[in-house]
Amino acid sequence: MQERELRALIAQVKDGKLSRRDFVRRMVAVGLTAPMAGLMLNHAGVAWAQAAFTYKPTKAGGGGSLKTLLWQAPTLLQPHFAVGTKDQEACRLFYEPLAYWDPEANLVPILATEVPSYEGGTLAKDGLWVVWKLKQGVKWHDGKPFTADDCIFTWQYAVDPATAAVSSGSYRDLKVEKIDDHTIKLNFAKPTPYWADAFVGWKGMILPQHLFEPYKGDKSRDAPGNLAPVGTGPYKFVDFKPGDLVRGEINKDYHVANRPHFDTIEMKGGGDAVSAARAVLQTGEYDYAWNLQVEDEILKRLEAGGKGRVGISPGGGIEHIQLNTTDPWTEVDGERSSVKTKHPTLSDKAVRDALNLLVDRASVEKFIYGRTGYATANFLNNPARFISKDTHYEFNIDKANQILDAAGWKRGSDGIREKDGKKLHYVYQTSINAPRQKNQAIVKQACEKAGISIEVKAVTASVYFSSDAGNPDTYPHFYTDLQMYNTTMPEADPAFFMNQFCSWEVAAKANKWQGRNITRWRSQAYDDIYRAAEKELDPVKRAALFIKMNDLVIADVVVIPVVARPKVQGLASKLQAPVSGWDNDFAQIADWYREA
């Protein structure tokens, strides 16, 4: 579709001759997805669509207790330290951003009164600023008023290097200006096509200045609020047992009418995905189970129990294997996997190419994930306009052997290939979870046929995905050769998702392993393309830049994509719970209710 045709269609929407839904459908047909189509209309001055979800309760409270299960247990309740998705989810019970992404990919205001727009004079056409108008009358859970000062403080808190906030990248290249007590202006250092980043979604959760001010910078980890949140959300904090249980109660002063529906909320952590699915779908002990990474065959069997249903939310999640570019077995200045080292064998491109051929993605899809994951060669799989057509995957043990032979990796007496005294022996870690252990087994079996020794390691999920900087077994530490997990894409734009390969995002001791570049891969070419995409306002040119980034990562075998995974949840039969594939599951927790 040419630019002229696109502009004509947008004009038809603005004139009321073409419905927003029909426009979105046409964009999807040519490789765009709902979130990007919505952003395009918004940039053209068309208002966001009304959410499709209908909230039926006519008063707040009265819904009893909502019992939810997260088999990866939360370990902290501070959104700007929440490396793991499960910690972000727990924070959404109590904290809120200015806006969130709903399941239909609409940007919905929550602490803001409206979404910025060109027509409203709150969005710059040159991409250099955006104005957010804040709700008035909103109170923190302790009764203090929510104002622009809290937004400015959150920005200052996140960008302070001593804080080591995982959200820092969203706030780094902007300045926040206070217009009045309920209006802020974000001034960007350069044209910013994706302005809905800071203060939006999980990275946008706003902190109360009056409670966190004494704990800025290097004191940030000492704040009582890290474990006992005081937010503006629908539920007030009651109790937290890290790695086990989060409890909240209704916020009777909540700023949205007739919400929330439930009187109390419980977020139980631990166990495994299968037991979580069973507790909702078969026994009905719980109302909601998060992130059901369970074989599809088992899910279908559990659904037959009649107590609940499986929900699938399309998004950009990718189950992938990471290859460590550094040496996890050598310590430098008190840290392993230091960027001052390089991996002794994975630094050989031939070895990485061979490993890429030894991952049987088709079998993983067919025998493990089914409708909950499809095989892919790409790291960036959504929105559709950003999917590369230049990559492909192949499972070929013979070709892997040929590559290793040609590169001089000879089999030793034990069958393991070696060269210059270095063996192809790798520790391959992931979280304890049946599909992941089956995935590990499939990879291990193929690797052994190519003379590569694989030692599998399975870490308790609550430990592996912990945000604890002192825990050496977390995935950001990456103290093994290979590791696997699902990384989510919690927003419609790939900018944040793809910054996890930027050199300035390297996870290290210096930033308390809060950096998003877990593989420690560094590429000047990638950095340059990413910087270009940050300021490119033409959506077509920008899409091409993200495709180039994906292709660089895949060509260098920095990661091995396995399956693209939508979000999968278990919901009790009567629970109405909008879940977005572009935000946290609990982003709309205020709208959840139980039908009579």
What positions do the PLM features span?
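Protein kinase glycine-rich loop
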Residues: 73-120
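N-terminal export signals
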Residues: 23-48
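Hydrophobic alpha-helical transmembrane segments of multipass membrane transporters and ion channels
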Residues: 29-33, 91, 555
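Active-site-proximal polar cores
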Residues: 562
